C-alpha cells in the first residue's frame, strides 16, 4: 500500500509548494481537503487520523490543535512546519544535515519539527564551528538576513504585489523584528549550540523567493589559530558527502563581486560561503537558499522521504 500523506494547510504558501514538489509522484497517496472545508475541524481530524504522515502548514496554535487531534493515534506521524515545536525536547529537529546522526533521528521520529527559513541558514553556519571548537562559549553572535516576501505568507504576498491593497508595502527593502524578539531566535540558540541568544536582524526584499543569511565574526575573538581557512575547512568537513548543502570553495568565493539573493529561488539546495581577506581581522559567513525551498517546503518533503525510508 502507498503511504497516505495529508497536508493540513495545503492551500497556504508552504502547503502549495509542498504539493508542487509532490506532483507526479506515484509512490504516495495524497489526502486532500477542499479549500472551502479547510476550517472544518471534524473533516480535518478524520483526514489527520487517516494519514501515515501529516504535514502541518498552519499557524502555531492550529498546529498544536492538530497534534492534539491525533494524540491517541500512534500510527500517525507528523511534520510540523510552524514554530510551535522546534525547541521541544521530544520532537526531532528536521535539519537533516545538522549532524551525521540527524537523518536517523528523523527516520525514527514520530514528531518532526521543520526548521524555520532563517534558522536553517544560521544554524548551517554556526553549529559546525561550535562543534569544531572554533566558536567559543559566550561569543556574541549576530545574524543578519534578508528574505523573499513569500516568507510572510499570503498576507504579505498581497501587500507586496497588490498596489491597491490598503496595507500595500512599496518599499524595495525593509527591516522588521525591531524589538529583537523574533520567534526564530530560540531555535537558532538551541540548535546552533549557543550559550547566548544571537542578535538577529531580519529583513524582507521586494523579490518573491530567495534568502541570504549572514554571520559576521571577529577572528581575534575565536579560538586560537582560527583563520579564514580553518573556518572554511570546518564547514567542508561537516558537510562532506552532502548533496543538498554545498560549501563554495574559497577561491570561487574570492572571485565574486556580489551575491544574488534569488539565485537559488525554486531550488531546494543551500550554498555556504566564507568571505574575508587572508590575514584579515574578520570573516563573514553567508548562507544562500530559497526561503520556500530548503527553508520550508523542500525541507518538509526531504523529512517526509526520510521518515518513509525508516
UniProtKB/Swiss-Prot annotation:
Main EC class the enzyme belongs to: oxidoreductase
InterPro entries: AGPR_AS (IPR023013), AGPR_type-2 (IPR010136), NAD(P)-bd_dom_sf (IPR036291), NAGSA_dehydrogenase (IPR050085), Semialdehyde_DH_NAD-bd (IPR000534)
Catalytic activity: N-acetyl-L-glutamate 5-semialdehyde + phosphate + NADP(+) = N-acetyl-L-glutamyl 5-phosphate + NADPH + H(+)
Localization (cell): Cytoplasm
Swiss-Prot/TrEMBL GO biological process terms: L-arginine biosynthetic process
Taxonomic superkingdom: Bacteria
Pathway info: Amino-acid biosynthesis; L-arginine biosynthesis; N(2)-acetyl-L-ornithine from L-glutamate: step 3/4
Main location: cytoplasm
GO cellular component, as recorded: cytoplasm
PROSITE patterns: ARGC
Disulfide feature: none
Entry keywords, A to Z: Amino-acid biosynthesis, Arginine biosynthesis, Cytoplasm, NADP, Oxidoreductase
Active site: 117
Keyword Zinc included in the entry's annotation: no
GO molecular function, one term: N-acetyl-gamma-glutamyl-phosphate reductase activity
EC number per UniProt: 1.2.1.38
Function of the protein: Catalyzes the NADPH-dependent reduction of N-acetyl-5-glutamyl phosphate to yield N-acetyl-L-glutamate 5-semialdehyde.
HAMAP family: ArgC_type2 (MF_01110)
UniProt family annotation: Belongs to the NAGSA dehydrogenase family. Type 2 subfamily.
Name the record gives this protein: N-acetyl-gamma-glutamyl-phosphate reductase
Organism the protein comes from: Rhizobium meliloti (strain 1021)
Gene: argC
